């Protein structure tokens, strides 16, 4: 795992097309902004896991 330190307003790049910007820090919460092409899905981990679980359930029914 790559670990980076960024300050509010600073950005990191993932590949050529995805940027992640630290928008704010309040207590133990960090607000981030993600710019990515429309064909790149961006989800919070818990939402991604739910989507994957629903896909698995669909495949099990087939």
UniProtKB/Swiss-Prot annotation:
A key translational regulator that binds mRNA to regulate translation initiation and/or mRNA stability. Mediates global changes in gene expression, shifting from rapid growth to stress survival by linking envelope stress, the stringent response and the catabolite repression systems. Usually binds in the 5'-UTR; binding at or near the Shine-Dalgarno sequence prevents ribosome-binding, repressing translation, binding elsewhere in the 5'-UTR can activate translation and/or stabilize the mRNA. Its function is antagonized by small RNA(s). Belongs to the CsrA/RsmA family. Homodimer; the beta-strands of each monomer intercalate to form a hydrophobic core, while the alpha-helices form wings that extend away from the core. It is found in: Cytoplasm. Gene3D superfamilies: Translational regulator CsrA. Signal peptide: none annotated. It comes from Idiomarina loihiensis (strain ATCC BAA-735 / DSM 15497 / L2-TR). SUPFAM superfamilies: CsrA-like. One of its GO terms (biological process) is positive regulation of translational initiation. This is Translational regulator CsrA. The keyword RNA-binding applies. Keywords: Activator, Cytoplasm, Repressor, RNA-binding, Translation regulation. GO terms for cellular component: cytosol.
